[in-house]
């Protein structure tokens, strides 16, 4: 395990607090904005001893190796991105350790996203469990290495459900490292929000919805689920995330 340069564990955490429903001193940054550094975001995280997902502890304190990060695939024309997006991809290292909520806050800060959107989407995808498995298949050709059990495997892993077939260079960090998993997924969202997910250009949305453009965070949230722009799958997914966002379900009793 590498030592994190932005590890909040050494800081004194206050007890559980309702401030986890607030955006703190960071939130949505428009396309083209200068994004905060990892260190700046570590300093902005609202620390708390609150940890509703103690099962995440090992993954929350694991950081990818330099070799693993070097194996990530570039974001360019061949992968459906404007080449400018690769500058975002190169910032992804999963270099943070903390509680599950602290990791989600840090991720939101780093990519200039409302933290409650990140929290709500993590509820939708995994109920905040980094161990979440999804998309069971009997097609061995789409299984991550080492996951085929002779009958089937799961394709999607982690707190925000990264699907192996579309993100091969991010395996096994997408399964094993919470900060990497969250940071990578929202790096994808940020590239979309900047207008740099080039394969979406020209894809027709459902009637009444706008075409792909920079600055539409909810369209980009839907794109994560369906791979398209305001198709019916994306629209339904957005509604689910928005409901968790409005209800702040991570603060409900029993979460």
Task: Tell where the protein language model's regions lie, with residue ranges.
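Short, functionally critical alpha-helical segments immediately adjacent to catalytic or ligand/cofactor-binding
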Residues: 102-105, 110-145, 162-163, 185, ...
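Non-catalytic cell-wall polysaccharide-engagement segments
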Residues: 2-82, 91-95, 148-155, 160-255
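Asp/Glu-centered strand-loop micro-motifs enriched in Gly/Pro and often flanked by an aromatic residue
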Residues: 87-96, 104-108
């Amino acid at each position: 395990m590498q030592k994190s340069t932005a590890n909040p564990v050494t800081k004194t955490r206050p007890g559980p607090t309702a401030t986890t429903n607030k955006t703190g001193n960071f939130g949505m940054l428009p396309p083209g904005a200068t994004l905060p550094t990892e260190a700046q975001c570590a300093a902005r995280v609202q620390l708390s001893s609150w940890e509703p997902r103690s099962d995440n502890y090992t993954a929350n304190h694991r950081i990818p190796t330099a070799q693993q990060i070097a194996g990530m695939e570039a974001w360019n024309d061949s992968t459906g991105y404007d080449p400018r997006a690769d500058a975002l991809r190169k910032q992804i290292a999963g270099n943070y350790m903390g509680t599950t909520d602290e990791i989600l806050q840090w991720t939101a800060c780093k990519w200039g996203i409302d933290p409650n959107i990140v929290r709500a989407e993590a509820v939708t995808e995994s109920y905040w469990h980094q161990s979440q498995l999804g998309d069971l298949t009997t097609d061995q050709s789409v299984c991550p290495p080492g996951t085929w059990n002779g009958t089937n495997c799961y394709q999607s892993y982690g707190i925000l459900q990264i699907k192996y077939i579309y993100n091969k260079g991010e395996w096994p960090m997408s399964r094993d490292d919470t900060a990497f998993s969250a940071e990578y997924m929202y790096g994808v969202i940020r590239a979309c929000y900047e207008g740099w997910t080039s394969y979406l250009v020209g894809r027709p949305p459902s009637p009444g919805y706008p075409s792909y453009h920079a600055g539409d965070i909810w369209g980009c949230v839907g794109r994560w689920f369906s791979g398209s722009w305001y198709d019916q799958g994306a629209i339904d997914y957005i509604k689910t995330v928005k409901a968790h966002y409005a209800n702040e379900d991570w603060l409900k009793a029993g979460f």
